[in-house]
């Protein structure tokens, strides 16, 4: 297991951020149970990557954003990844995700961060307000992966989080300290 990764989970209020985390990590969320508004919580999970390595991930479950509320500035520091959540039955929640993506791009200081977008409540087809193809088109343009998920079906949650953990912990292909052939093995700094 490598370093612990910090992932900020954010989106509009009542889109299912906490329910997604509790169902993913513990499998104990009951659909339709009373919602308690989150202030800010931290969940720690161990996720097996596509390389078969278990990685520890700290999920920062943020308060649901409402009009006028922005993501707190501390959510942008030392963050390895983001999970942006909207509800497929709310166009407003999708617009909030679009704004969050712009805010992240502005604040990430050229650091590579992994962003996944989850459209929750995909099982409520008759209440759908966000077009699946339009959302995928937006995600492709933003170079982020988007999955439609349902807390009612835990299996839909697994693939996005394996992708997230795998992408954040990808081994470096090159050394952080490349040595030219000329200097290899000399060990001497003075000339």
From Swiss-Prot:
Region feature (Disordered): 170-191
Superkingdom classification of source: Eukaryota
Small GTPase-like: region residues: 1-191
Gene3D superfamilies associated with the record: P-loop containing nucleotide triphosphate hydrolases (3.40.50.300)
Localization (cell): Cytoplasm
One Pfam family linked to the record: Ras
GO BP annotation list: inflammatory response; negative regulation of canonical NF-kappaB signal transduction; Ral protein signal transduction; regulation of tumor necrosis factor-mediated signaling pathway; surfactant homeostasis
Short sequence motif Effector region: positions: 35-43
Residues that bind GTP: 11-18, 61-65, 120-123
UniProt-listed InterPro entries: KBRS, P-loop_NTPase, Small_GTP-bd, Small_GTPase
One GO MF term: GTPase activity
GO cellular component: cytoplasm
Keywords assigned by UniProt, alphabetized: Cytoplasm, GTP-binding, Nucleotide-binding
SUPFAM superfamilies documented for this protein: P-loop containing nucleoside triphosphate hydrolases
Family per similarity comment: Belongs to the small GTPase superfamily. Ras family. KappaB-Ras subfamily.
Free-text comment about domains: In contrast to other members of the Ras family, the members of the KappaB-Ras subfamily do not contain the conserved Gly and Gln residues in positions 13 and 65, which are replaced by Ala and Leu residues, respectively, and are therefore similar to the constitutively active forms of oncogenic forms of Ras. This suggests that members of this family are clearly different from other small GTPases proteins.
Function comment: Atypical Ras-like protein that acts as a potent regulator of NF-kappa-B activity by preventing the degradation of NF-kappa-B inhibitor beta (NFKBIB) by most signals, explaining why NFKBIB is more resistant to degradation.
Protein name per Swiss-Prot or TrEMBL: NF-kappa-B inhibitor-interacting Ras-like protein 2
Organism per entry: Gallus gallus
Gene it is expressed from: NKIRAS2
């Amino acid at each position: 297991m490598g370093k612990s990764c910090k992932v900020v989970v954010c989106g509009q209020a009542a889109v299912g951020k906490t329910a997604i985390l509790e169902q993913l990590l513990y499998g104990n969320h009951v659909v339709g149970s009373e919602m308690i508004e989150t202030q800010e919580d931290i969940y720690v999970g161990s996720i097996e990557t596509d390389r078969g390595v278990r990685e520890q991930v700290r999920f920062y479950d943020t308060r649901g954003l409402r009009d006028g509320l922005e993501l707190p500035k501390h959510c942008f520091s030392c963050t390895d990844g983001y999970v942006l959540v909207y509800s497929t039955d709310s166009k407003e929640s999708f617009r909030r995700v679009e704004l969050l993506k712009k805010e992240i791009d502005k604040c990430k200081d050229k650091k590579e961060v992994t962003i996944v977008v989850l459209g929750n409540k995909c099982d409520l087809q008759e209440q759908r307000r966000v077009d699946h193809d339009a959302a995928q088109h937006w995600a492709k343009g933003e170079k982020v992966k988007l999955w439609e998920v349902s807390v009612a079906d835990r299996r839909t949650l697994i693939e996005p989080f394996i992708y997230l953990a795998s992408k954040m912990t990808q081994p470096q292909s090159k050394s952080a300290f490349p040595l030219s052939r000329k200097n290899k093995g000399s060990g001497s700094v003075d000339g």
